[in-house]
Amino acid sequence: MHFLFLLFSFFTFLPINDKGLCNLNNTAFNAGEKISYTIYYNVIGLYVNAGKTDFTVQSTSFNDNDAFTFTAIGKSNSKYDWIFKVRDRYESVVDAKTLLPYQFTRQINEGSFHKKEMVKFNQKARTASTEEEVYKTSECTFDVVSAIYAARNFNYSNLAINDKIYLNFFLDKSLYPSYFKYLGREVITTKYGKFEVIKLAPLLLKGSMFEGGEKMTIWVTDDENHIPVRIETPIVVGSIKVDMVGYQNIRYPLSSLIELVNN
């Protein structure tokens, strides 16, 4: 199980309303944004700081089209590098208007496992191309990184409890359809502070680390930024918690923040 995939696993199964994201407008973030997270692992009732990841947004161009570059960099806690060293980088270049990906790359360095991959998307032809093969996709296909930012632009205001919302994404040579379930609104306290949040439960595919089903919970800020501030999920051994611990250059004031936690 790849380190950043612990984080992406919930985002990649954050599917989007079939009415919406083929023609979305970005209203949730600006170029220059940076969101930082700490990943905690719990195996015997005690959460251990296992690593961190940063998500950034930059303006760019791709084939003379205005674009964004989304980058996620994950690192294991240096205290545990001698056990299992992780240095991962995921990057997606997307159309600035639709947020659909042009190109997705990832560099995985985890212990003795190393992998580099590039996928080029043709949204009109509905294909995803690697060095080895061209794969058929579907209308509005995202990669794991672009799906995060697309989901932040979804309008949650008209959902009823247990509504399901759908998205297609391409990963590891396969196209995945899935959904997430809207569970309502509440207030939670994270490592950063107390927030008004939107609560979501994505459908996870069964894998080596996850049991599958709707066992993961995600909380995103109940404001125009829609920033994920906490993720919790059981895994085969123990559980994982991911908390937002910092941000820079967000598009709107963080109006969902009720109070900061004194660290």
Locate predicted features:
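Acidic, serine/threonine-rich low-complexity disordered tracts
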Residues: 16-121, 159-263
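Sec-dependent N-terminal signal peptides
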Residues: 3-12
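Hydrophobic, well-structured mid-protein blocks that either form specific transmembrane helices
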Residues: 113-156
